[in-house]
Amino acid sequence: MGRSPISDDSGLKKGPWTPDEDEKLVNYVQKHGHSSWRALPKLAGLNRCGKSCRLRWTNYLRPDIKRGRFSPDEEQTILNLHSVLGNKWSTIANQLPGRTDNEIKNFWNTHLKKKLIQMGFDPMTHRPRTDIFSGLSQLMSLSSNLRGFVDLQQQFPIDQEHTILKLQTEMAKLQLFQYLLQPSSMSNNVNPNDFDTLSLLNSIASFKETSNNTTSNNLDLGFLGSYLQDFHSLPSLKTLNSNMEPSSVFPQNLDDNHFKFSTQRENLPVSPIWLSDPSSTTPAHVNDDLIFNQYGIEDVNSNITSSSGQESGASASAAWPDHLLDDSIFSDIP
């Protein structure tokens, strides 16, 4: 016949024991012993169950409990008994005087079991483990993968630096090509038919760009370097076009040293550098240093003002030099 069921313990205290409860339990056991743990709580005046009183006495309050570290002999005894009995901690504790089953169980889980695993033994059978060799191939593959990953991590900074240097080189080449292609693209966008409507400053800038493409022409523009300043104060003259002869614009009584033209006079570029249309009433001021090394022009600082009516006549005497006021110079100008 089995043990009778435990009565209702809804009103019993649970949780940690207090020093007062420990003292009551020790005094009762020392005087009367522990004949029945189920009846002991009421006899000792404790609001606890019998099992709680038994565990408290056996694991903590018993006077013959041995404290401290386990000796090597105790460790070997636990290993031998566990290989035969298994996890029967109470039976093992009976073979070790002064040690409780709870203490032996904790010592096994925290020390002895890990020690057997490190030595290559199965903690349940105490025999060498054979499952290690079954997973050896997986361990080898994992090791090779980790080694490759480490090598990749070590090589990544070098590859990244190489990639950055390569990108910088490509960007430098791209900027160089853009710089080399910029003058030709700008000169191709210039329309010679729009010179009459563009300002004088834009015309000069366009002439700078287009002058580099006319080096093959046999035009001798050396006279501009020496005599351009003599005509920077002249009033507005007609723009030279394809239907006009140079003799109708330039004076005929000047020396040939002043104006040198090539045999191919039709190759003269139509560019109003210092010639302007007298019908224009908008003054255009140019304060640029024109440097054309290909045609012998070193430094020309001109301030050209084109106006109409009496304003140009009033300022002519103040702006023109005396040797240019001679009537013989303008006798052939229509």
From Swiss-Prot:
InterPro entries: Homeodomain-like_sf, Myb_dom, Myb_TF_plants, SANT/Myb. Pfam families: Myb_DNA-binding. Residues 37-61, 89-112 bind DNA. Probable transcription factor. The gene is MYB92. It is found in: Nucleus. SMART domains: SANT. Interacts with FBX5. Residues 9-61, 62-116 form the HTH myb-type domain. Disulfide bonds: none annotated. Induction: Induced by gravity in roots. This is Transcription factor MYB92. Its main location: nucleus. Keywords: DNA-binding, Nucleus, Repeat, Transcription, Transcription regulation. GO terms for molecular function: cis-regulatory region sequence-specific DNA binding; DNA-binding transcription factor activity; transcription cis-regulatory region binding. GO terms for biological process: positive regulation of fatty acid biosynthetic process; suberin biosynthetic process. GO terms for cellular component: nucleus. Highly expressed in roots and at lower levels in stems, flowers and siliques.
